[in-house]
UniProtKB/Swiss-Prot annotation:
It is found in: Nucleus. PROSITE patterns: ZINC_FINGER_C2H2_1 (PS00028), ZINC_FINGER_C2H2_2 (PS50157). One of its GO terms (molecular function) is DNA-binding transcription factor activity, RNA polymerase II-specific. This is Zinc finger protein OZF. Liver, skeletal and heart muscle, mammary cells. Very low levels in brain, lung, placenta and kidney. Strongly overexpressed in many pancreas and colorectal cancers. Increased gene copy numbers are detected in 3 of 12 tumor cell lines and 2 of 12 primary pancreatic carcinomas. Overexpressed in 80% of colorectal cancers. Belongs to the krueppel C2H2-type zinc-finger protein family. GO terms for biological process: regulation of DNA-templated transcription; regulation of transcription by RNA polymerase II. InterPro entries: Znf_C2H2_sf (IPR036236), Znf_C2H2_type (IPR013087). The keyword Ubl conjugation applies.
Length: 292
């Protein structure tokens, strides 16, 4: 390190300023790397996978994902990480620290990125667009998972029955069928659920809370998924298309029912006469024949 560089560190002198945002640096090389943020230039490329970064420090951090090296270990639980900032974020789970709070509803988060994604539930912003069907998402990870519908990729397989899923969360939900575990119980009525999110939605039955409101007609819903489906009644969007006949649907569940026309699948069987049905509603209607 040169004598001049050392002097700047001790004096706190930062003579190099960014013309775009005004941020100052002690070295011109640091300013040059910073300016890549504004120009979106990514000159630092990973030799393993070709992924590019705006700063050298980020490509160095990224390369740890290929080596598998995890130098940073949590003192509480022993879990290790390839990057120090990932360890610091993880440690907040143990401390309960949630420094990033939503100004609209007060909900707090461990990570700033989670707060930004959450705030989109208030603004309705969905900047990530599927190139196949045009469906939009508030988070990039949601788009990535959705895209598996189009390519037919189902990498998450149940070890019990072999059923495969495009998204990990659906596999986890499915596995509770085999275990029967329902650890989340409602304090109001005692009803138990296998998933925490299901309990949260259920509690709204008692509270009457409907936080998701349609910007077009003002109708409110207890679940964001219900609002998403409802909005399609205004837009006419039908993102779920049948590969057999091309018919499109606004809900995935409706497409799943429709597919049984082509597959001939009839999972609902009458215990009285053995007649089978493709839809549960048809099965229930049929059973009334035997009760009358």
């Amino acid at each position: 390190m040169s004598h001049l560089s050392q002097q700047r560190i001790y004096s706190g002198e930062n003579p190099f300023a960014c013309k775009v945002c005004g941020k100052v640096f002690s070295h011109k090389s640091n300013l040059t790397e910073h300016e890549h943020f504004h120009t979106r230039e990514k000159p630092f490329e990973c030799n393993e996978c070709g992924k590019a970064f705006s700063q050298k420090q980020y490509v160095i951090k990224h390369q740890n994902t290929h080596t598998g090296e995890k130098l940073f270990e949590c003192n509480e639980c022993g879990k290790s990480f390839s990057q120090k900032e990932n360890l610091l974020t993880h440690q907040k789970i143990h401390t309960g620290e949630k420094p990033f709070e939503c100004k609209d509803c007060g909900k707090a988060f461990i990570q700033k990125s989670n707060l930004i994604r959450h705030q989109r539930t208030h603004t309705g912003e969905k900047p990530f667009v599927c190139k196949e069907c045009g469906k939009t998402f508030s988070g990039k990870s949601n788009l990535t998972e959705h895209e598996k519908i189009h390519i037919g990729e189902k990498p998450f397989k149940c070890s019990e029955c072999g059923t495969a899923f495009g998204q990990k969360k659906y596999l986890i939900k499915h596995q509770n069928i085999h275990t029967g575990e329902k650890p989340y119980e409602c304090n109001e009525c005692g009803k138990a659920f296998s998933q925490r999110t299901s309990l949260i939605v259920h509690v709204r039955i008692h509270s009457g809370d409907k936080p998701y409101e349609c910007n077009v007609c003002g109708k409110a819903f207890s679940q964001s998924s219900s609002l998403t489906v409802h909005v399609r009644s205004h837009t006419g969007e039908k993102p779920y298309g049948c590969n057999e006949c091309g018919k499109a649907f606004s809900q995935f569940s409706t497409l799943a029912l429709h597919l049984r026309i082509h597959t001939g699948k009839k999972p609902y069987q009458c215990s009285e006469c053995g007649k089978a049905f493709s839809q549960k509603s048809h099965h229930i209607r049929h059973q009334k024949i035997h009760t009358h």
